[in-house]
A protein has these predicted regions:
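Substrate-binding pocket helix/loop in short-chain dehydrogenase/reductase
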Residues: 134-135, 139-144
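SDR active-site lid
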Residues: 207-280
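Conserved glycine-rich Rossmann-like NAD(P)H-binding loop of the short-chain dehydrogenase/reductase
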Residues: 62-77
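Active-site helix of classical SDR
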Residues: 158, 194
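Conserved glycine-rich cofactor-binding loop
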Residues: 39, 46-47
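Rossmann-fold cofactor-recognition segment
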Residues: 84-104
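Residue(s) in the substrate-gating loop at a strand-loop-helix junction
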Residues: 178
Length: 313
């Protein structure tokens, strides 16, 4: 006797979920094994995403070179990585002070990075500087600082390690960018400009180095949701328009550092050239920017007048 459909359907769902889980576990295991012995540079290892990447790649057996602007934080990360690690399976990380806001130091930084192991297999550029302000209030000096950290720094480091990658005809350069490298929103003029510049640079680089077997990847994500900030005790919740509040929540519903770090690992192992980590509304906005820009411009202009969107974008 055939089983009723109402019985078969739940069984199929359970079996499919089990297969999907096993598949993900196998892929995750293979991903870690693929980075073993690889020389991996993380430009901002002390950030939330950088720390997650450091733990992930360290467990996978990569030879890490960890960059950051704060030596104490780098040493703390070093201790957390090595305290419970098996020295037979992992390598002690190398630490390098790396500050993209100091462009005069970049030549020395490149030399120090290459001296660690003589080459770089994977460069992860995840350093970033953010700013939210009306255009007229942003000084030219601040514009330059943001361009140094978000564009000139990553591009200079990529140029610095490129000759060794070309000579070995292998390597991977990954830019952790932002959705605002594709879509500019109000009050993020300097930040969006720097991210657009970085996106364009690495897109050009990808085409130029493909013949040498070098992979260039970009990951465009919404904001990184490192923590939740509830309202202070006794603080009244602001009155907002329901539709505007929904749109704002979608635009600012960020990516957790652990999720982004796993995506970085998957991107490296699958050699993806471009990844967009965004929820439906930013994706729709990207489509509107391409196919119906006047409508998007009108929505953004109207959003500036709405207190909710102004605060959340």
């Amino acid at each position: 006797m055939a089983l009723p459909f109402v019985v078969v359907l739940p069984l199929l769902i359970v079996v499919a979920a089990g297969v999907y889980y096993i598949y993900n576990e196998v892929i995750r295991f293979m991903s870690k094994s693929l980075v073993r012995n690889k020389v991996v540079v993380i430009t901002d290892a002390v950030s939330g995403v950088g720390t997650e990447c450091a733990h992930l790649f360290h467990k996978g057996g990569a030879r890490l070179i960890l960059g950051g602007t704060n030596w104490d934080k780098l040493e703390s990360l070093y201790d957390s990585l090595t305290s419970d690690a098996d020295p037979r399976e992992t390598f002690a990380p190398k630490l390098v002070i790396l500050d993209f806001s100091d462009m005069d130091s970049m030549e020395d930084v490149v030399s120090e990075v290459l001296e660690c192991y003589g080459c770089v297999d994977l460069l992860i550029c995840n350093s970033s500087m953010k700013l939210k302000a009306p255009i007229q209030s942003v000084s030219l000096e601040m514009d330059r600082n943001i361009m140094d950290v978000n564009y000139f720094g990553p591009s200079a480091l990529a140029k610095g390690v490129l000759p060794t990658m070309i000579s070995r005809r292998s390597g991977h350069i990954l830019l952790v960018n932002s959705i605002q490298g594709r879509l500019a929103v109000p009050f993020r003029s300097s930040y969006a400009a720097s991210k657009h510049a970085a996106q364009a640079f690495f897109d050009c680089l990808r085409a130029e180095v493909e013949e040498y077997g070098i992979v260039v990847s970009t990951i465009s994500h919404t904001f990184i949701d490192a923590s939740h900030h509830p309202l202070a005790a006794g603080e009244p919740a602001p009155k907002t328009n329901a539709l505007a509040a929904f749109i704002a929540s979608q635009l600012t519903h960020g990516v957790r550092p652990s999720v982004l770090a796993n995506e970085i690992l998957q991107t490296v192992n699958r050699k993806r050239k471009e990844v967009v980590l965004a929820h439906p509304i930013p994706r729709v906005a990207l489509c509107l920017r391409s196919f119906c820009p006047p409508f998007l411009f009108a929505v953004l202009a109207a959003g500036v007048k709405d207190s909710v969107l102004t605060e959340q974008m």
